């Protein structure tokens, strides 16, 4: 029999409100709406299907305050992560958000109304306190803290929700079990004990050995329950990961394991997140939950120190084990013993026994370079999936982003680099000069700081898509502001390499060699907002390469860029 849900009752709002669906649908069509972000959609899905039981909506101020300070909802139930609906002042005013108001919650992807929230309250959180209490630090090297300060809006809206419809998914539909569906599935299979395994990474032989070992020790079955909502920036995409999990499943003894996907937006909150994960798995019917070393940790802070200790998460869940009602299965890192061809937890291996390990960094290197990945580490069918999604370095896309004053020589360098890379062959090459983008993509934009930032954001989006497709993107806007250049880097680096080339030709040289006379017009006041004349240029502090066409020619500058690309393995021939 499945584990009772957290709080005693599974808050399956989809099932609860099904008899009123048409009535709620008709009402929502007439209501003002809040369009939900990706994180809010993930949160709403787990509110609606009962994954976040005992929640029945987004937290009001009383619940939020209790969770932040004490891991407690207002009714005393344990809950460790704030589940909040953040909105801007503009949205509050436009939509008419106020206590007692009924607001539709709309899916940004297909414009469908998913639920109606009855507003309990609107409050302004202390985000510094939230960061320190929930995540243990206000350091923006933590992705959740960065999100809190730079993405989450300034006000939170609390209130219960009524379900109109479930979110629509088009990928792996057969693996997307709600808590109620998964409980029924366990019951159908006759499973009494279920060990849940949380992951946001591909699984290899060590993970299989770990989960089988946990099942054997508890005489239980295994739920592989990976997160396919939002994970840590830079993680492998969920499409690749799910194909890996599917490839791995036949390696389990028949009838031992089930794969189900969890649409969770992770916060990488370490100890607090581990408690939250345990609650979610309890709601899905699991009786046991594996908590590993540095569970849901975000890595290192801005000082190079881990945000959390390696076993802080295990300690946090153990502290609340009786109240959680789910047995924690702590585990050490598994290591391979070549002499006996087996995996064991590191704490069970004598110091004189030979062991082998491959780190995540080493695995990524081997995928990038095409080096062998041994069968003792991962199964051939898993490696095949990973290689399909991670081609060798010389088949990956990249972006070269040239920035500098008007007439600094960046356009000439970009054109010459375009010719050079096309001659090299092996991938398609796209050239996006500043003036081309202005005429084709950003013709309605002016030269205010806001419009310049929008222009760079559009360039970054196009470059990222080209990079993702394995192409070389060469872009050459003026891009005078550090913040927009950094945002461009972050956008592109989700999919491939980004190289910032500062064409540091001095302003006086660019102006002196200007044959088109644009600097003269700017000096005469005929052109306003001209970079270097009446608008600033913030020189890059983190350029990957600096060239100066007042001291070197275009051919030499291009050769320097080619050497940079070659040093990263991007131009190496197969």
UniProtKB/Swiss-Prot annotation:
3'-phosphoadenylyl sulfate binds at residues 435-438, 452, 478-479, 516. The active site is at residues 199-201. The record marks 331 as: Induces change in substrate recognition on ATP binding. It holds the Pfam family PUA_2. Coiled coil: none annotated. Allosterically inhibited by 3'-phosphoadenosine 5'-phosphosulfate (PAPS). GO terms for cellular component: cytoplasm. Residues 171-395 are annotated as: Catalytic. The record marks 204, 207 as: Transition state stabilizer. GO terms for molecular function: adenylylsulfate kinase activity; ATP binding; sulfate adenylyltransferase (ATP) activity. PANTHER family: SULFATE ADENYLYLTRANSFERASE. NCBIfam families: apsK (TIGR00455), PRK05537.1 (NF004040), sopT (TIGR00339). Homohexamer. Dimer of trimers. This is Sulfate adenylyltransferase.
